[in-house]
């Protein structure tokens, strides 16, 4: 089971400049097993692209399934965001930096409930979710 991140789905559904690479990566992943979206990704894609039912139908048409975030993943996300805030403070950076809870929920879901994550945000997920297989669409 491989999870897919919002940025890649926006490329696919919005026909963005990375759409071809994202499509090739998704096809490869689907060839080896299920590809899933978690609650956060479904919410973010809906917010970015339109009506929920239409978005979920489009995801279903692409062969993606829904995988809700489990309690253990939610707890891990909170722990990782706490580390992020502590690192930012220690480095003298503003705590209100771009990383919000949704990023940590997506990462924890992929780490604990899946076998990898398709994303364009390689650095963040490798840094905070050690052991997570990060799959980046090649452009």
Predicted features along the sequence, with ranges:
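Acidic, PIN/NYN-like endoribonuclease modules and their adjacent C-terminal/linker elements
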Residues: 1, 107-139
């Amino acid at each position: 089971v491989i999870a897919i991140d919002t940025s890649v789905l926006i490329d696919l559904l919005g026909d963005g400049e990375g759409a071809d690479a994202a499509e090739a990566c998704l096809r490869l992943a689907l060839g080896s097993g299920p590809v899933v979206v978690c609650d956060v990704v479904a919410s973010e894609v809906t917010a970015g692209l339109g009506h929920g039912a239409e978005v979920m139908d489009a995801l279903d048409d692409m062969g993606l399934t829904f995988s809700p975030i489990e309690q253990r993943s939610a707890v891990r996300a909170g722990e990782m965001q706490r580390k992020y805030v502590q690192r930012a403070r220690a480095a003298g950076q503003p705590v209100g930096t771009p990383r919000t809870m949704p990023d940590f929920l997506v990462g924890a879901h992929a780490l604990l409930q899946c076998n990898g994550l398709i994303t364009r945000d390689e650095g963040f997920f490798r840094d905070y979710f050690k052991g997570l297989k990060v799959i980046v669409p090649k452009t």
